[in-house]
């Protein structure tokens, strides 16, 4: 005889696949929601409706959609809701847990139906919150070979009002998934969540500051919060407030917390010095034991003295560091007690135990706050502050500089000097174009001082001039002076964009075309390096329609790529070069140059450029300076082979005389030096006629038309 077997129904299935927001708020495990009162009120209104009482929060990632639901749950816990929503529990459904292990047909539907049945049986006392609600569309259909997806199981119960659901998703995903399912869209009521303003974001962060301070055990100054909002809004364009500003504070606090628990830099430096000196001492003492004749006994004694001094300094700083750390840990313990007491006061007041709450509020908390002030004063009395315990604007600037590679941190003396000397440094490389150098270096200074227009590039320039006068070289050397690397420049050769459709190379192919999944050359380069010199070389060679893409870059400092992502050009220097009107520049006729420029470049583009700079033709003095620079570079290259060669004035005069060409600028000089001087020196090096570690002077004999190398002892011809 076979008995029929009925499996026991699983109880509390809802708690297995979800988390109760009310419980977590009661345990003070969720940060409070600051502001967003209008959205929370709208949420309550929709949930109080008879029909279409399933709100869905729609907004960009990071604007605070989940925080609004948590704020609503907090109002329920505090009893600040209408009677129909009192004692209601907000339960967040975990979709990943729900679908895990449902590989057999029907298992997913069974599990979801059990959850929905439990919600239904609660008689409206449970509200389901589903984050990323667009995932319901299609969920369960593929993984468990089901005939229905999660959305189709939910829809009938939502239509009958048997369950209430709060959803949250982004604008793109709502459009892509939910709008396509008309029945699901009709059952939900949209609440648009906009990005908060800077002031609203700052209010949110000020409200959360105590929680961050308690968690990271560091002090966060108000100027750090202001800087986080302002700098994130200006320099991080692909994310949204308040999330991006909160991330900056969190990152800076984590950085300081890590430093607190690590050896201070002062102690670490001394430790490294002791290691280096001890290593050198050990090597010298070993040589002394082996009776080497060249052992420096004086150096051994000096090393012993230095090691002793550094060890004493290390011991002194270690004692101070230990004392400061002990006081700091005591302060943190007291602050933690204050936080716990504050939470206990709220709990007691909610229960109506006001006597006990008053005792904690007016007796216990002031006692601990007095102790905190005493310990803080004790910590501030140390002359050597080895523990950094606070975050200011400087730390926020360091974090954002590290993340975006945009130099915002406080100027150190070396960098300050480099910026002030930028004009002189550029003049060393570029000869005869002082006007161009001044304008470009001034633009960099404005940008670094952060007084330029924040909604446009740091500077935009159009360099006009004949070939070979230094237009491209200015951009290269500017990148070198700013980043110590010419490759930091983003160079776009506009001769590659002669067809109308070649604009796709810059921002990527549009949807449906081959290469849509590949990024554009320009957009990808700036997303990777937002602080860069961007050179559009020879713009007259590109198709006129391709240049239209520059309009929004120059005007708004941003560009939308093929994936509809904003690319931020507000921290770039835009340089365009052109040979338009070169013959008029050589003829010293600026009016005709501008006339030809207006014929070939559209006025709306010219009107957006900050400065139109005309590079003049090079005269003999300029060419002589360039020849000296080229020969100096050649001398530096030869020095790598331990051969010192200098070039006299006769060589320079000969190079300028035979190698210059007004039409072609400085490039013929380079070719002449390569053809005549470099070939001569190469033969001498291959023939081993030049000795290493010797100095030579290279000269030119005009009568014999020969080059000669002269040293102190003999001539090599």
From Swiss-Prot:
Q: Where in the cell is it found?
A: Cytoplasm
Q: Name one GO cellular component term.
A: cytoplasm
Quaternary context = Homohexamer. The oligomerization is ATP-dependent.
Q: Name one GO biological process term.
A: cellular response to heat
Q: InterPro entries per the record?
A: AAA+_ATPase, ATPase_AAA_core, Clp_ATPase_C, ClpA/B, ClpA/B_CS1, ClpA/B_CS2, ClpA/ClpB_AAA_lid, ClpA_ClpB
C-terminal: annotated span: 618-717
Entry GO MF terms: ATP binding; ATP hydrolysis activity
| Highest taxon above the source species | Bacteria
Q: Does the keyword Repeat apply?
A: yes
- PANTHER family named in the record: ATP-DEPENDENT CLP PROTEASE, HEAT SHOCK PROTEIN 104
Q: What is this protein called?
A: Chaperone protein ClpB
Q: List the residue ranges of the region (NBD2).
A: 415-617
Q: What keyword terms does UniProt attach to this protein?
A: ATP-binding, Chaperone, Coiled coil, Cytoplasm, Nucleotide-binding, Repeat, Stress response
NBD1: region residues: 12-195
* Family membership noted in the UniProt record: Belongs to the ClpA/ClpB family.
Note the coiled coil stretches, chain numbering. Answer: 246-384
Its main localization is cytoplasm
Domain statement: The N-terminal domain probably functions as a substrate-discriminating domain, recruiting aggregated proteins to the ClpB hexamer and/or stabilizing bound proteins. The NBD2 domain is responsible for oligomerization, whereas the NBD1 domain stabilizes the hexamer probably in an ATP-dependent manner. The movement of the coiled-coil domain is essential for ClpB ability to rescue proteins from an aggregated state, probably by pulling apart large aggregated proteins, which are bound between the coiled-coils motifs of adjacent ClpB subunits in the functional hexamer.
Task: Name the gene behind this protein.
Answer: clpB
Name the residues that bind ATP 2.
Answer: 465-472
Entry annotated with the keyword Metal-binding:
no
Extract the Gene3D superfamilies matched here. Answer: 1.10.8.60, P-loop containing nucleotide triphosphate hydrolases
For the ligand (ATP 1), the binding residues are 59-66
């Amino acid at each position: 005889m076979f008995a029929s077997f009925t499996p026991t129904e699983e109880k509390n299935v809802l708690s297995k696949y979800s988390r109760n927001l009310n419980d977590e708020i009661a345990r003070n495990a969720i940060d409070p929601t600051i502001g967003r009162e209008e959205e929370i009120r709208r949420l309550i209104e929709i949930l109080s409706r008879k029909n279409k009482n399933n709100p869905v929060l729609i907004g960009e990632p990071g604007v605070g959609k989940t925080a609004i639901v948590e704020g609503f749950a907090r109002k329920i816990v505090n009893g600040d809701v209408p009677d129909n929503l009192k004692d209601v529990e907000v339960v967040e459904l975990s979709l990943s847990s729900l679908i895990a292990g449902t590989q057999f047909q029907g298992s997913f539907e069974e599990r979801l139906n059990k959850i929905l049945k439990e919600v239904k049986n609660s008689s409206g006392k449970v509200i389901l919150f589903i984050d990323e609600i667009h995932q319901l569309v299609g969920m369960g259909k593929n993984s468990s070979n089901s005939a229905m997806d999660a959305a189709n199981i939910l829809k009938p119960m939502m239509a009958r009002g048997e369950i209430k659901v709060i959803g949250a998703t982004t604008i793109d995903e709502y459009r892509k998934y939910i709008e396509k399912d008309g029945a699901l869209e009709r059952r939900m009521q949209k609440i648009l969540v906009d990005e908060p303003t800077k002031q609203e974001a700052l209010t949110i962060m000020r409200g959360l500051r105590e929680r961050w301070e308690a968690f990271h055990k560091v002090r966060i100054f108000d100027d750090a919060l202001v800087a986080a909002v302002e700098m994130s809004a200006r320099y991080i364009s692909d994310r949204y407030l308040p999330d991006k500003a909160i991330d900056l504070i969190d990152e800076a606090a984590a950085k300081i917390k890590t430093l607190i628990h690590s050896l201070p830099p002062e102690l670490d430096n001394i430790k490294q010095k002791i290691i280096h000196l001890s290593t050198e001492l050990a090597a010298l003492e070993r040589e002394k034991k082996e009776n080497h004749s060249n052992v420096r006994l004086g150096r051994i004694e000096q090393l012993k003295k230095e090691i002793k001094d550094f060890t004493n300094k290390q011991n002194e700083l270690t004692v101070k560091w230990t004392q400061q750390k002990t006081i700091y840990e005591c302060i943190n313990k007291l602050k933690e007690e204050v936080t716990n007491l504050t939470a206990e006061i709220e709990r007691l007041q909610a229960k109506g135990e006001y006597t006990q709450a008053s005792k904690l509020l007016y007796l216990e908390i002031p006692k601990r706050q007095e102790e905190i002030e005493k310990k803080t004063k004790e910590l501030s009395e140390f002359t050597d502050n080895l523990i950094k315990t606070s975050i200011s604007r400087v730390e926020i600037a360091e974090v954002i500089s590290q993340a975006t590679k945009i130099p915002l941190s406080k100027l150190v003396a070396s960098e300050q000097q480099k910026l002030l000397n930028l004009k002189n440094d550029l003049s060393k490389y570029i000869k005869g174009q002082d006007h161009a150098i001044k304008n470009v270096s001034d633009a960099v200074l404005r940008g670094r001082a952060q007084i330029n227009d924040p909604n446009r590039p740091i500077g935009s320039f159009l360099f006009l001039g004949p070939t070979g006068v230094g237009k491209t070289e200015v951009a290269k050397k500017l990148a070198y002076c700013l980043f110590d690397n010419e490759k930091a420049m983003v160079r776009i050769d506009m001769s590659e964009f002669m067809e109308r459709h070649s604009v796709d190379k810059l921002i990527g192919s549009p949807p449906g075309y081959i290469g849509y999944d590949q990024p554009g050359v320009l957009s990808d380069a700036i997303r990777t390096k937002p602080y860069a010199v961007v050179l559009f070389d020879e713009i007259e060679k590109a198709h006129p329609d391709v240049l239209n893409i520059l309009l929004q870059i120059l005007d708004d400092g941003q560009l939308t790529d093929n994936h509809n992502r904003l690319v931020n050009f507000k921290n770039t220097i835009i340089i365009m070069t052109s040979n338009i009107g070169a013959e008029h520049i050589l003829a010293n006729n600026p009016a005709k140059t501008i006339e030809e420029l207006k014929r070939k470049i559209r006025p709306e583009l010219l009107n957006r450029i900050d400065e139109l700079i005309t590079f003049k033709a090079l005269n003999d003095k300029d060419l002589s300076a360039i020849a000296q620079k080229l020969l100096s570079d050649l001398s530096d290259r030869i020095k790598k082979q331990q051969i010192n060669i200098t070039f006299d004035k006769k060589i320079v005069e000969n190079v300028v005389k035979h190698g210059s060409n007004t039409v072609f600028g400085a490039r013929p000089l380079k070719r002449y030096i390569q053809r005549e001087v470099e070939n001569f020196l190469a033969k001498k090096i291959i023939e081993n006629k030049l000795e290493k570690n010797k100095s030579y002077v290279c000269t030119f004999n005009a009568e014999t038309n020969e080059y000669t190398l002269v040293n102190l002892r003999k001539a090599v011809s």
